[in-house]
Amino acid sequence: DLLLNSIMGMRGLKPTLAAIDSGKQIALANKETLVAGGEIVMQKVAEKGTTILPVDSEHSAIFQCLQGGVKPKKLLLTASGGPFFGKKRFELNKITPEEALKHPNWSMGKKITIDSSTLMNKGLELIEAVHLFSVAPENIEVIIHRESVIHSMVEYADGAVIAQLAKPDMRLCIQYALTYPNRLQSPVQGIDFLKIGSLTFAEPDEETFTLLPLARNAIKKGGNIPAAVNGANESAVSLFLEKKISYLDIFDLVAQAAENAVYIKKPSLDDILQTDKAAREFVRAKTR
C-alpha cells in the first residue's frame, strides 16, 4: 500500500508518522515533514522497514540518479532562481505578493512559489535532502539553473556526474513516485534538445537571498532549529500574502525567530511541535 502525502506545511508531519506506523510506503510531497522532524521520521522509517519515495522534482531526480546504489560524493540541487534572480536586496523592498507569485517556469501553490522567490524553498530542500539521502549539508551544493530542465545531479568519487532531465512538469515526479519502480507512459512530452539550445548555470546570491544560508546553518546546528526556521517562514509567508508585512520582512523575521529559538539537541515530537508553535507566535508578535 502507498500513501501520498501532499498536505502543505507542518500539518503533514503527524499523518506521515501515522502512515509509517501502519507500515505503508509513502510518496512524500510534504517537505516540511522532513525539515522539521527529519530525524524522528527517518528513525521511524528504519524501525518499520518502510520507504519514503520523494515527490519533489529535485529529490525525485536525486533518487533516480542514486539507483546504482553507490554512495555519492556530492549532491547538486538545481534552482530556477525565481522571478527575482539577479536583483539585489535594495531592489526587493517594494515587491508585492502578485510579483512574487510569478514564477518563471513552474506552476505551483502560493506558499511554495513565494519560497522559491526567496530561495527558502531551496534551503528547505537542502534540509530534506540531508535526511532523505544521509548526506552531510556541506556535501550538497545549490546551483542556479534558469531553464529548470536539469532537476538535480549526483557527483560520484570518480568525478562522474549523473543528472536527471525533464520538462518542468510535476506530473512526471508524481507519476514516478506512484508507479516506482516501473516507468509508464506519461502525459509529459520529452525534451527537444535542439529547441533548448543551451543550459546555463550560476552561483546563488546568498548575500541577497539570505534564507538559503540560514537554512544550511540550521541543519548544520540540527536539533529543533530547522523546525523553528520552518515555522517562522510559514508564518512570515502567510503574513506577506495577506499584505501585512513587506517582502524583506520575511527574511528578517525568519532570521530573528531562528536566533530566538531555545536549542534542543535531541528533540522529541512534542519539542518539535512546541518549537514550531513558538516560532510562529514570535513572528506574529513582531508584526502586531
Located regions from the model:
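Catalytic, metal-anchored helix/loop core of enzyme active sites in primary metabolism
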Residues: D1-R288
